[in-house]
Design a protein with these regions (language model features):
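N-terminal secretory signal peptides that target proteins for export/translocation
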Residues: 1-14
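Extended intrinsically disordered, low-complexity coil regions enriched in Ser, Thr, Gly, Ala
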Residues: 59, 63, 67, 72-79, ...
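Vicinal oxygen chelate
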Residues: 36-43, 46-57, 96-109, 120-207, 239-264, ...
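Core segments of cupin and vicinal oxygen chelate
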Residues: 54-105, 150, 166-170, 217-270, ...
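Short, charged/polar, Gly/Pro-enriched secondary-structure boundary elements
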Residues: 117-118, 184, 282, 347
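Bacterial N-terminal signal peptides
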Residues: 16-34
Length: 354
């Protein structure tokens, strides 16, 4: 009986050791991160590379951005074919893509030669969630505003506004909203001496210096941060709650109270999330919005690992515009691979890899 008991004890020890080994192996397998978890070791997205807008007449837009806002034309290309159809989600497209630069930052103006899309709704407001603008830095907003008036731009703001001291993160910032010929909202912005990137305080005699950020209207900041911060790897670098008569007249929204969150990548301009706490009546992005519609903006982000980015987006069920990762062998837009996805509010985001 005693020998049997020893054998039983030994058996239990062996079985126990085997269970520990199996458990350890299972734990090790469970702890292997998924492919897209590279974001834990570094952001999936490195930079905002450019902001794109669909325009009705490329020549008219080139003239506006170069003559009025001092952008320089860098390239002018016509694109067509199945690769771009699969990327943009528009069948039978032929588009003229014009790249323009101001300082270190770039925009892309895209005219769809075929097929033509819908115009911007004339009753659009700053709290509608198709709203997106680029913030163009000036060293002298009074002189810049006078220049815009001379060129008969369409106002959104009633006049340039100086944000008050009680909005501490934005105190002293001066800004003005207006529109380009296709009714895309734009902002000119002047930072006080204690705010903004140091390069925005070196004018070299120029009136307009570059693009600080692009701002988008969102329904819920936390939901948007799950996309931009948790998945793509942007850093939240500032937040404020803006309200009062100056903010109302800047946005031209009575009773405007906004939660504003500033995001930055490793390089390039930032992204600002604009959540209207009041009024809450902003309309959602149209479900039938397409790249050839004039309301369309497309923010291009650079990634070193497009496959990991796609995996992360699919894991979270963010809707793709593209059929998947699209190969662009000729790299006419400067990238060999790209895809377009919609953020939680429907804003189109292009992820591109050289």
């Amino acid at each position: 009986m005693q020998r049997q008991s020893k054998r039983g004890v030994c058996s239990r020890i062996v079985v126990g050791q085997l269970c520990v080994a199996i458990t350890s192996l299972a734990f090790s397998i469970a702890c292997v991160p998924p492919m897209w978890a590279a974001a834990a070791h570094g952001p999936l997205v490195r930079a905002v590379e450019s902001v794109g807008m669909t325009v009705a007449d490329a020549d008219r837009s080139i003239d506006f951005y170069s003559t009025v806002l001092s952008f320089q034309k860098i390239s002018d290309t016509e694109l067509e074919g199945s690769d771009y159809e699969h990327l943009e989600g528009v069948f039978g497209l032929r588009m003229r893509v014009v790249r323009m630069r101001l300082g270190d930052e770039s925009i892309e103006l895209t005219e769809y030669l075929s097929p033509k899309g819908k115009p911007v709704a004339m009753d659009s407001h700053s709290n509608d969630r198709w709203f997106q603008h680029i913030a163009i830095i000036t060293v002298d907003i009074d002189r810049a505003y006078a220049w815009l008036r001379q060129n008969r731009v369409q106002h959104v703001s009633s006049a340039p506004q100086t944000l008050p001291a009680y909005i501490k993160p934005a105190a002293g910032v001066r800004a003005f909203y207006f529109e380009d010929p296709d009714h895309h909202p734009l902002e000119i912005l002047e930072f006080p001496s204690d705010k903004g990137n140091p390069k925005w305080h070196r004018s070299d005699g120029k009136l307009f210096l570059g693009i600080d950020h692009t701002a988008i209207a969102v329904a819920n900041t936390s939901v948007s941060l799950a996309f931009y911060q948790d998945v793509l790897g942007f850093r939240a670098v500032g937040e404020s709650e803006n309200y009062g008569p100056e903010q109302e007249h800047l946005n031209n929204i009575f009773g405007a109270r906004l939660r504003i969150t500033s995001l930055r990548g490793v390089e390039g301009p930032g992204i600002e999330l604009l959540e209207y706490l009041t009024p809450r009546g902003g309309r959602s992005m149209p479900v039938d919005e397409q790249a050839n519609d004039l309301v369309h903006h497309q923010t291009r982000l650079v990634t070193d690992d497009l496959e990991a980015a796609l995996k992360a987006l699919q894991e979270k069920h963010y809707p793709l515009v593209s059929s998947g990762i699209v190969a662009l062998p000729k790299a006419e837009i400067g990238f060999h691979f790209a895809l377009i996805v919609r953020d939680p509010d429907g804003h189109p985001i292009e992820l591109a890899k050289r």
